[in-house]
């Protein structure tokens, strides 16, 4: 079954690569219209998924991610229309020029071909990824989590209806709607057909893809994010930043999970932190120094293994460090190269932190919550990459392209 999907996707990718920006935008507009017109069928499938997930004991946070409402589906359709407004990178000439040989060279952006995406209980990802892939002339094979397979199947049928209405192959967007987990392992070996694989899920999924995939894999989205409160930090704005980074949307990958506090500011800062976190409903997981704190916040002893994991909840590790060296060493040992920040009034320390912390996004006196395609001015994103090849940070449209070299001659031969 999967090989046939791969063959069809590869064939579809050749047709998509030839579409103009206007043609691709018309397809996206049609998809948005069909999502609204076929809302009832998608929501009906989603109700079944939610009921099954609740019966299986899925957490309330995960159920909320899984649930679609008319308003949420309308917002998803509007997001597709927003993709139409993004600049199309395909065909862009990156650089080039006339060589001494007389050959004129261009380096031009082109689609990747076929993108594979494996993701969990987020039905919006189906549409987000499909729209970004179509905008960049790529076909896509989607494998959502078992919790959303009815919703994903219904959504992809609607997208395929729009593709067909626009005269394009339905295989441009396909979903593996069989929840059998063994199909994931089969998908990971489809390098003959899939050009890039993006897993969006937990550490276990990422580890599986890195170890088993014969396809180039872009991993990321796991955010053990840190904020370092330097000795010169201004306490009032620092607290505002920490509250935003922890409480705005705790379940996201750009939420802060560990707060590192310079020992020289700890005595003044920690009581204010406790008061602010109590008001925000955050539980502090403190080291030995922090556990001596007497304040209103709920405080529990820090477990070392928690330093390497995402909470994705209103929980925050708090560790007192001796100096900047200690903060950087901690981030290198426990971070995931996602997003890390320093709060300081010392621009020398800020520059050092930016230069020495090797993460996809590094902030000075700002919240980690900004690591997002929309916030970066990239428009929508397909994922957040924490590796260095071939994309890093929020992956917008350009990250779904590669390039080719094109040489123009006039009977030109190599001497």
UniProtKB/Swiss-Prot annotation:
Main subcellular location: cytoplasm
Matches recorded under InterPro entries: Ald_DH/histidinol_DH, Ald_DH_C, Ald_DH_N, Aldehyde_DH_dom, G-glutamylP_reductase_CS, Glu-5-SA_DH, GPR_dom
Keywords, sorted A to Z: Amino-acid biosynthesis, Cytoplasm, NADP, Oxidoreductase, Proline biosynthesis
Pathways involved: Amino-acid biosynthesis; L-proline biosynthesis; L-glutamate 5-semialdehyde from L-glutamate: step 2/2
Catalytic reactions of this protein: L-glutamate 5-semialdehyde + phosphate + NADP(+) = L-glutamyl 5-phosphate + NADPH + H(+)
Disulfide bonds: none
Superkingdom assignment: Bacteria
UniProt GO cellular component terms: cytoplasm
A GO term, aspect molecular function: NADP binding
Annotated compartments: Cytoplasm
Pfam families named in the record: Aldedh
CDD domains recorded: ALDH_F18-19_ProA-GPR
GO biological process, one term: L-proline biosynthetic process
NCBIfam families for this protein: PRK00197.1, proA
Biological role: Catalyzes the NADPH-dependent reduction of L-glutamate 5-phosphate into L-glutamate 5-semialdehyde and phosphate. The product spontaneously undergoes cyclization to form 1-pyrroline-5-carboxylate.
Protein family: Belongs to the gamma-glutamyl phosphate reductase family.
Designated name of the protein: Gamma-glutamyl phosphate reductase
Organism: Salmonella dublin (strain CT_02021853)
């Amino acid at each position: 079954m999967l090989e046939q999907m791969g063959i069809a996707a590869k064939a579809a990718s050749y047709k998509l690569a030839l579409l103009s920006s206007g043609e691709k935008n018309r397809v996206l507009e049609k998809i948005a219209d069909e999502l609204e017109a076929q809302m009832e069928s998608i929501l009906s499938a989603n109700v079944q998924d939610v009921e099954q997930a609740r019966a299986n004991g899925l957490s309330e946070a995960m159920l909320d991610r899984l649930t679609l409402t008319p308003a949420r589906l309308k917002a998803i359709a509007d997001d597709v229309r927003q993709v139409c407004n993004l600049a199309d990178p395909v065909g862009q000439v990156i650089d080039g020029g006339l060589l001494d040989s007389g050959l004129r060279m261009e380096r031009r952006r082109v689609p990747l071909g076929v993108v594979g995406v494996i993701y969990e209980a987020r039905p919006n990802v189906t549409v987000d990824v499909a729209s970004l892939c179509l905008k960049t002339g790529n076909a896509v094979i989607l494998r959502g989590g078992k919790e959303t397979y009815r919703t994903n199947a219904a959504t992809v049928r609607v997208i395929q209806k729009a593709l067909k209405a626009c005269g394009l192959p339905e295989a441009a967007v396909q979903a593996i709607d069989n929840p059998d987990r063994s199909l994931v392992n089969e998908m990971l070996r489809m390098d003959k057909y899939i050009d890039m694989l993006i897993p969006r899920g937990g550490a276990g999924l990422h580890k599986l893809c890195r170890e088993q995939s014969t396809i180039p894999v872009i991993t990321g989205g796991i955010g053990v994010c840190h904020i370092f409160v330097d000795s010169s930090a201004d306490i009032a704005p620092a607290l505002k930043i920490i509250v935003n980074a922890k409480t705005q949307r705790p379940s996201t990958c750009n939420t802060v999970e560990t707060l590192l506090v310079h020992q020289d500011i700890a005595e003044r800062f920690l009581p204010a932190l406790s008061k602010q976190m109590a008001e925000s409903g955050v539980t502090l997981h403190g080291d030995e120094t922090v556990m001596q704190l007497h304040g209103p916040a709920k405080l529990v002893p820090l477990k070392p293994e928690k330093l390497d994991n995402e909470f994705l909840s209103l929980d925050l590790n708090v560790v007192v460090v001796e100096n900047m060296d200690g903060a950087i060493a901690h981030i290198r040992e426990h971070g995931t190269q996602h997003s890390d920040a320093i709060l300081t009034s010392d621009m020398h320390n800020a520059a050092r932190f930016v230069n020495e912390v090797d993460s996809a996004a590094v902030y000075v006196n700002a919240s980690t919550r900004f690591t997002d395609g929309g916030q970066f001015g990239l428009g929508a994103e397909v994922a957040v990459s924490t590796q260095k090849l071939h994309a890093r940070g929020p992956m917008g449209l350009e990250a779904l392209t590669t390039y080719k070299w094109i040489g123009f001659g006039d009977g030109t031969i190599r001497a």
